[in-house]
Regions:
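Helicase motor core with emphasis on the C-terminal RecA-like subdomain
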Residues: 6-11, 15, 19, 23-35, ...
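Accessory DNA-binding and partner-docking regions appended to nucleic-acid-acting proteins
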Residues: 1-4
């Protein structure tokens, strides 16, 4: 039995890898730059976490969202794996302290946003770390043709100059051929091994419902499926109004949109993650990296901006492999 499989069983309690997790892990362990295009819920995180545990040193994870970083760090810590994140609310003194601890080998995973790489002093400190792998979350953000372009992602390629022999692993769930090529070019990946998996999610059922009364229809759906749900709307006003209407009907709902203060976003997210709120009513600000296995229903009551957003948002459902809508 491989060491990678033993770690999967020990920390994640899964008996076997999904296709093509094991091949991706081996590619990284062989020192290759690697690009993984896997569907939402396809187990992308394990593809960098396991090789990072097998290699000496620390894994640097570049991630676009505070909520995503905190969720992954908490997930690793719950498995007794030492991880830390440089999030926006961390002071400069705390950053220095965290980086010192990374240098002394007290952490296996360091998460940070791409914007942190715009600070020269942080990059200088990173150069002193024994980095064994650089993992890029939501890699489509590096492409101007992607649906969530973040200019700061273009700074990641500079790490290649400092760590020419350290493997890069770029991961995303949404990238057409043009975006894939852009990712590999903009991240300066060297002869990357490319892995893709079918985007068919057998456990997801898609429905288009015609109705004159959306709220009544939502009430029916949520009553029939009382498990965790997400409702996507196009703007903040609809977000607040829909949540208020649901609460008046006796459902427990909370909201998430770009205009909320960070603390309120975190509080609402936690309420939903802990199933204190059945329904999260959200704009597309609530999207990348949200990994809650038991989401039963994702409802779009207004059209999303594009098909990529729809695929990502609908893909929040059924990550535990059970039937979802």
């Amino acid at each position: 039995m491989s060491e990678a499989l033993l770690l999967l069983q020990k920390y994640w309690k899964h008996e076997t890898f999904r296709t093509p997790q094991e091949e991706i892990i081996q590619s990284v362990l062989d020192g290759n730059d690697t690009f993984a295009l896997l569907p939402t819920g396809g187990g992308k995180s394990v593809c960098f976490q396991i090789p990072a545990l097998l290699l000496n040193g620390i894994c640097l994870v570049v991630s676009p969202l505070i909520a995503l970083m905190k969720d992954q760090v908490q997930n690793l810590q719950s498995r007794n794996i030492k991880a830390i994140a440089l999030t926006g609310g961390v002071s400069q003194d705390e950053v220095i302290d965290i980086l010192d601890n990374c240098q002394f080998g007290n952490y296996k995973f360091l998460y940070l946003s791409p914007e942190r790489l715009q600070h020269d002093w942080i990059v200088e400190r990173l150069k002193q770390l024994p980095i064994n792998l650089i993992a890029i979350d939501e890699a489509h953000c590096v492409s101007q043709w992607g649906h969530d372009f973040r200019p700061a992602y273009l700074k990641i390629s500079a790490l290649k100059e400092h760590y020419p022999s350290t493997p890069f692993l770029a991961r995303t769930a949404t990238a057409d051929k043009r975006v894939q090529e852009d990712i590999c070019t903009n991240l300066a990946l060297v002869n990357p091994k490319v892995f893709t998996k079918s985007f068919t999610r057998e456990n997801l059922a898609y429905h288009v419902i015609k109705t004159e009364d959306k709220l009544f229809k939502i009430q029916q759906i949520l009553t029939k499926n009382p498990q965790s749900s997400i409702i996507y709307v196009r703007n903040r006003k609809s977000c607040v109004e829909t949540s208020q209407q649901l609460n008046q009907l006796g459902f427990t709902s909370t909201i998430y949109h770009g205009g909320l203060p960070t603390k309120e976003k975190e509080k609402n997210m936690q309420s939903w993650l802990e199933n204190k709120s059945q329904v999260m009513v959200a704009t597309n600000a609530f999207g990348m990296g949200i990994d809650k296995p038991d989401v039963k229903t994702v409802i779009h009551i207004q059209l999303p901006e594009n098909i990529e957003n729809y695929y990502q948002e609908a893909g929040r459902a059924g990550r535990n492999g059970e039937k979802a809508f």
